[in-house]
Design a protein with these regions (language model features):
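Repeat-solenoid scaffold signature
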Residues: 1-15, 23-29, 214-216
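Substrate-binding clefts and catalytic carboxylate motifs of secreted carbohydrate-active enzymes
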Residues: 4-5, 15, 24, 35-205
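Short acidic, flexible loop segments centered on an aromatic residue
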Residues: 203-216
């Protein structure tokens, strides 16, 4: 920092990313960028993302297995079990499989069949990360951006990616596409109220907008 100040005193300098804390410290959400691993290492529910809003989210995420077609490239049917030797070799987060099942149990019935477990894990990852993406967009201009961890993989593996090693989109990538759409309509229950948010990243305002609401 001293050298930057000496050579280019008008240049803004940020000493690191994240600016203060990796996750779990509310004071770190007030300045610069933040990493929030509460829904992973902190084992918090996805709803925590609705209130833990940083100025800029530069990293957060949740794991999922790749689809069965990708798993079949490195495992045989006899290896299709969550804690098989082959599956553990392709899971580099120490308690990753435990966290996937634990969080899945908060929202869905945990399937016994491995292929169904993989499928529901993909759904879970997509829904959870999308919840964070939409929360960050809703809180603009306080929060002016969000990046999720991570885009893709360097080998076929259980990971936080939204695209697997072979280029197959996980459910998360489709959910991220929807969450980052130029115009997003988001309904969220806040207390006793159901609030509707309409967010637009268009450079020009739409002259006419119609919102239709159907109660079922």
């Amino acid at each position: 920092p001293r050298k930057v100040a000496e050579l280019d005193p008008d240049r803004f300098y940020m000493h690191g990313s994240p600016y203060e804390a990796n996750w779990g410290r509310p004071e770190s959400w007030k300045i610069a960028d933040s990493h929030n691993w509460g829904i992973w290492y902190g084992q918090k529910p996805f709803e925590s993302l609705d209130t833990e809003i940083p100025r800029f989210m530069s990293e957060f995420g949740f794991q999922a297995f790749p689809e069965m077609k990708t798993i079949a490239t490195f495992a045989s049917p006899e290896d299709y079990a969550l804690e098989s030797e082959v599956m553990n070799a392709h899971q580099k987060a120490t308690i990753g499989n435990f966290l996937i099942k634990k969080t899945m149990g908060l929202y869905y019935k945990v399937p016994e069949d491995f292929d169904q477990l993989v499928y529901m894990g993909l759904v879970l990852q997509g829904v959870g990360v999308r919840q964070g993406l939409e929360a960050h967009r809703r809180n603009r201009p306080y929060c002016m951006g969000t990046l999720y961890w991570q885009l893709n993989d360097s080998w076929p593996v259980v990971s936080w990616s939204s695209i697997d090693y072979y280029g197959n989109w996980k459910a998360l990538h489709y959910q991220a596409k929807r969450a980052f759409a130029p115009v997003l309509v988001d309904a969220i229950k806040e207390g006793e109220d159901l609030n509707i948010y309409v967010m637009s990243d268009k450079l020009e305002a739409d002259k006419e907008v119609t919102l239709g609401l159907r109660v079922m």
